[in-house]
């Protein structure tokens, strides 16, 4: 007599699903972080596309002056944006079910919160998925560490800055010109160009571009010849080959003579660590700078700091930036009741004309 033992299909199905999720043989690795990443990024992308095309104007300032951001309301690819949620909403969580109607939700900029929250969860999950795949393959975890730099930057402009300023209406709009507007207003209100963390970020981005171009051009110029003049040099490399495809000694000698010896790396591993670390650390500092300025710890103020012998101001670049910032601020605050205090013409009235005696 033959006895057949069959496992319960439910448990077997769940095990198959777990094996599929964590398998490194799939064309695209899913992972448990991917189970969270895929639906959130799909939701954010879908809502962004629909809102960018067809969303009605949003009362961003909370003063019944709606701002149109979608293509169907007269914008183009450059000027269009998903407008941030209304200042009347502030920092309140504003899902669809919190509004009295869909029209109210759209008028108050609900799609912005939907896109941003799903997007942030999605990129956090993507970073976790990078770590998860590295772990499965036995690799070091530095890929997700490098990715943490743009994640920190996105978190700073979409989450930390609105928290510090008290409203999601101060977050960065989701569009090209909206991004530029955010940058101009940020300079006007926080003097970011005079903040040392922003300077470190500029050095990180521009320096990273320079080092990447230098490295790529040096490697391309010192490739080991494997092809004829009539063939593409790319045919001289076979994926997985053990031989070096370029002569690092030649590249080191060239760059050492071009500048000086110790400006050139003689270790490929330390070189590539430097290429990764430089822009990552710079963008970390930028994100940290935006996060501190969110709570109004602003850039340095050197306005009218240099005087001549008669006490007259000698304008410096700091004064030029200050005048530009005042102009940008008055254009941004276009209503009388929001007129910037530092542009008020009248002298401020002291609360007490005489300090009370203590003791």
From Swiss-Prot:
Quote the record's binding site residues for pheophytin a: 126
Q: Which residues take part in binding chlorophyll a ChlzD1?
A: 118
* Keywords for this protein: Calcium, Chlorophyll, Chromophore, Electron transport, Herbicide resistance, Iron, Magnesium, Manganese, Membrane, Metal-binding, Oxidoreductase, Photosynthesis, Photosystem II, Thylakoid, Transmembrane, Transmembrane helix, Transport
Sequence positions that bind Fe cation: 215, 272
Where found in the cell? Answer: Cellular thylakoid membrane
Q: Has keyword Calcium?
A: yes
An example GO biological process term is:
photosynthetic electron transport in photosystem II
Q: How is it modified after translation?
A: Tyr-161 forms a radical intermediate that is referred to as redox-active TyrZ, YZ or Y-Z.
Q: Which GO terms describe its molecular function?
A: chlorophyll binding; electron transporter, transferring electrons within the cyclic electron transport pathway of photosynthesis activity; iron ion binding; oxidoreductase activity, acting on diphenols and related substances as donors, oxygen as acceptor; oxygen evolving activity
Record site feature (Cleavage), residues:
344-345
Q: How does it sit in the membrane?
A: Multi-pass membrane protein
Residues annotated for chlorophyll a PD1 binding in this entry = 198
The residues forming a coiled coil are none
Q: What positions belong to the pro-peptide in this record?
A: 345-359
Give the E.C. number(s): 1.10.3.9
Positions annotated to bind a quinone: 215, 264-265
User: Residues at site: Tyrosine radical intermediate?
Assistant: 161
Question: What cellular-component terms does GO give this entry?
Answer: photosystem II; plasma membrane-derived thylakoid membrane
Q: Where is this site: Stabilizes free radical intermediate?
A: 190
Q: Where are the transmembrane segments?
A: 29-46, 118-133, 142-156, 197-218, 274-288
User: Per its database record, what is this protein's job?
Assistant: Photosystem II (PSII) is a light-driven water:plastoquinone oxidoreductase that uses light energy to abstract electrons from H(2)O, generating O(2) and a proton gradient subsequently used for ATP formation. It consists of a core antenna complex that captures photons, and an electron transfer chain that converts photonic excitation into a charge separation. The D1/D2 (PsbA/PsbD) reaction center heterodimer binds P680, the primary electron donor of PSII as well as several subsequent electron acceptors.
Q: What else is known?
A: Cyanobacteria usually contain more than 2 copies of the psbA gene. 2 of the reaction center chlorophylls (ChlD1 and ChlD2) are entirely coordinated by water.
Please give the NCBIfam families that the UniProt record associates with this protein. psbA
Q: Record's family?
A: Belongs to the reaction center PufL/M/PsbA/D family.
Q: What is this protein called?
A: Photosystem II protein D1 1
Which organism is the protein's source? Synechococcus sp. (strain CC9311)
Lineage, opening ranks: Bacteria, Bacillati, Cyanobacteriota, Cyanophyceae, Synechococcales
